[in-house]
């Protein structure tokens, strides 16, 4: 099974996987961008042995899907689906971690910049330490022909090639978790699964006011985690898993510590307990 849901309002990521259960993942693509659901929708595979993927292209141009979690010949599995075409491939999800998937059709820059990406979590056979809350944050940037507020807006390829975004976001919307903060209680462990979808910029992941108790850089859930880490670079196309346990009631900004990104919307708030103060980040 696969799971999760639109995460734009910041719900926890539930574990809907199980040992040895096959997954049938259906991702109809169209030219408007995204893959059959809201930008950055997370899928949780939880200790799967085999994944079956069916790509149906309902658009007017070729599309494909590239799973970073797969060990498979890309010329067979990640090939273009022509308009109206549907095909299926299978892969073994044997490497635990949080991975990006995205449209890999040329120009890849344009397809990712149009929102055709997401995150997939593969849980390890030996469970990670218990977390009270789990959140998926997918960083990306947007290059718009308008300010992105008034529709319609479309991709500005000149801006994309110049790496000059109008907005930088978590899960597709600038500042959404400032308006709708994530939450936990004092003493609870919060786990963040972070993917940098790019298409170009990294996420310099940092939580203001605390230090990561555990950090699995590069989404390596096989090796022991780093401990006592302040900021970890999640490269474009990469992932990372981060645990924090916060005892003090308060509001904790979650940022990419490249502060141009914060100014352009890549900031979230984690409210621990019922804080009364505010932050200026």
In which residue ranges do the predicted regions lie?
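Short linear motifs in low-complexity or flexible loops
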Residues: 2, 6-11, 15-17, 22-24, ...
């Amino acid at each position: 099974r696969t799971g999760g849901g639109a995460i734009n309002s910041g719900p926890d990521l539930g574990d809907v996987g199980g040992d040895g259960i096959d997954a049938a993942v259906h991702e109809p693509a169209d030219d408007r961008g995204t893959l059959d659901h809201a930008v950055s929708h997370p899928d949780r595979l939880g200790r799967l042995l085999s994944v079956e993927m069916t790509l149906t292209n309902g658009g007017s141009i070729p599309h494909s899907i590239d799973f970073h979690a797969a060990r498979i010949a890309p010329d067979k599995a990640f090939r273009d689906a022509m308009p109206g075409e549907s095909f299926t491939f299978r892969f073994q999800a044997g490497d635990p971690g949080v991975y990006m998937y995205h449209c890999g059709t040329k120009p890849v820059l344009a397809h990712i910049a149009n929102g055709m990406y997401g995150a997939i979590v593969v849980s390890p056979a030996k469970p990670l330490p218990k977390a009270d809350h789990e959140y998926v944050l997918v960083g990306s940037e947007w290059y718009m022909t308008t300010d992105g507020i008034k529709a319609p807006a479309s991709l500005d390829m000149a801006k994309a090639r110049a790496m000059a975004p109008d907005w930088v976001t978590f899960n597709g919307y600038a500042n959404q978790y400032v308006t709708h903060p994530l939450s936990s209680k004092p003493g609870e462990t919060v786990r963040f699964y972070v993917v940098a979808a790019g298409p170009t910029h990294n996420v310099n992941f940092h939580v203001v006011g605390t230090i990561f108790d555990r950090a699995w850089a590069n989404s390596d859930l096989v090796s022991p985690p780093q401990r006592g880490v302040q900021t970890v670079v999640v490269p474009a196309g990469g992932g990372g898993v981060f645990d924090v346990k916060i005892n003090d009631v308060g509001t904790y900004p979650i940022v990419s510590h490249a502060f141009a990104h914060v100014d352009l919307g890549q900031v979230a708030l984690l409210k621990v307990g019922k804080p009364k103060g505010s932050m200026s980040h």
